[in-house]
Amino acid sequence: YTLSLHDALPILGIFVANQQSIEGAMIQMLSHGIVSAALFLCVGVIYDRAHTRDIKFYGGLVNRMPHYAVAFMIFMLASVGLPGTSGFVGEFLIILGAFKFNTSLAFFAATGIILTAVYMLYLYKRIIFGIITNEKLKNILDLNRREKAIIIPLIIVVILMGIFPNIFLEP
């Protein structure tokens, strides 16, 4: 469902058709591509170790996989649009452009963003914190060098896009 909102926001930005919303749509599409790929990569990491996608079997991963927990947190926060990450820039510009066009439209879009943030943060809490109940997770290993070599550049891009968005907007 979060992917649906992140697909709808750039469409809103394109149809509002002012400079802020168009720039926001471009950044949001780029950010969404990177962050979604990173989140799927994070899911793949724990699936590779536990061989289940069922969320109820996860919990307490921060105790066994602290590097994974940090990487997953960064991508999750970028997905919900935390300032300083790539997700914030696109969402902010789209909402700003939508607000200039129609305040009600901007309000509904912002409400969707907030509801998505609640869902994503609950998901993060459920997977990362708590106690380990699945026996397969008792000896689970943290990120290896190969996984870090893939994840760290994605983290750098997500943060660079959030701090220096003009790099991606200037011709």
Model regions and ranges:
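Functional transmembrane alpha-helices
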Residues: 4-141, 161
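Hydrophobic alpha-helical transmembrane segments and immediately flanking/interface helices
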Residues: 95, 170-171
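Glycine- and aromatic-enriched alpha-helical transmembrane segments of multi-pass membrane proteins
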Residues: 142-170
